[in-house]
Amino acid sequence: MKTARLQVTLRCAVDLINSSSDQCFARIEHVASDQADPRPGVWHSSGMNRIRLSTTVDAALLTSARDMRAGITDAALIDEALAALLARHRSAEVDASYAAYDKHPVDEPDEWGDLASWRRAAGDS
């Protein structure tokens, strides 16, 4: 398996697009580590928390992802991948919590009665 070394040094600047909006959009810039920028950026005192990520990844996987999302930085690509991973994990947690309901049918009585009767009564009111 071929691997590629992905080293990302990030500087993130947050620009408020519309001051009347609660939404802000982040502009992510890929800055080479050997470049010195004497200007303190917006990110210096009020930006998103960012870390440096240095890892080895599958070259074909990285190339395919870059081709699929052409035009975005590696940092944004990694952000999207991590967000998708967390969303999938959260979805699995929700599915597992619903599985608990399958163990006990809605009309199964417990110490408080049964949920089906309660739903009918609530619907009639």
From Swiss-Prot:
GO terms for biological process: positive regulation of growth. Keywords: Toxin-antitoxin system. It comes from the Bacteria. Induction: Repressed by Mce3R. Antitoxin component of a type II toxin-antitoxin (TA) system. Upon expression in M.smegmatis neutralizes the effect of cognate toxin MazF5. Forms a complex with cognate toxin MazF5. This is Antitoxin MazE5. It comes from Mycobacterium tuberculosis (strain ATCC 25618 / H37Rv). The lineage of its organism: Bacteria, Bacillati, Actinomycetota, Actinomycetes, Mycobacteriales.
